[in-house]
């Protein structure tokens, strides 16, 4: 009985993927829309003079004149 219970617990953990992942856009400039699955809990969008120059996972440090917008919801960096 204990073996069956342990097997069910392990199977549940493997199937549910307890590590949370997030989906962020990662296309550059005018490329077609693409997404990536991220382990980080942020997505970001870099802009320069009003033009989006980079998208991705995380929230990297940035210095002016490049602007950085970080967000915490699925596909929020479009």
From Swiss-Prot:
Major site of localization recorded for this protein: secreted
Keyword Nucleotide-binding: no
Superkingdom classification of source: Eukaryota
Signal sequence coordinates: 1-21
Tissue note: Expressed by the venom gland.
MF-aspect GO terms: acetylcholine receptor inhibitor activity; ion channel regulator activity; toxin activity
One GO cellular component term: extracellular region
Keyword terms of this UniProt record: Acetylcholine receptor inhibiting toxin, Disulfide bond, Ion channel impairing toxin, Neurotoxin, Postsynaptic neurotoxin, Secreted, Signal, Toxin
Location of this chain's protein in the cell: Secreted
Family: Belongs to the three-finger toxin family. Short-chain subfamily. Type I alpha-neurotoxin sub-subfamily.
Function: Binds to muscle nicotinic acetylcholine receptor (nAChR) and inhibit acetylcholine from binding to the receptor, thereby impairing neuromuscular transmission.
Record protein name field: Short neurotoxin 342
Source organism per UniProt: Drysdalia coronoides (White-lipped snake)
């Amino acid at each position: 009985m204990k073996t069956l219970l342990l097997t069910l617990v392990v199977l549940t953990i493997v199937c549910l993927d307890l590590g949370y992942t997030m989906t962020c856009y990662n296309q550059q400039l005018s490329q077609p829309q693409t997404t990536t699955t991220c382990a980080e809990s942020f997505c970001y969008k870099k802009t320069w003079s009003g033009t989006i120059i980079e998208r991705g996972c995380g929230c990297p440090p940035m210095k002016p004149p490049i602007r950085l917008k970080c967000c915490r919801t699925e596909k929020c960096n479009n």
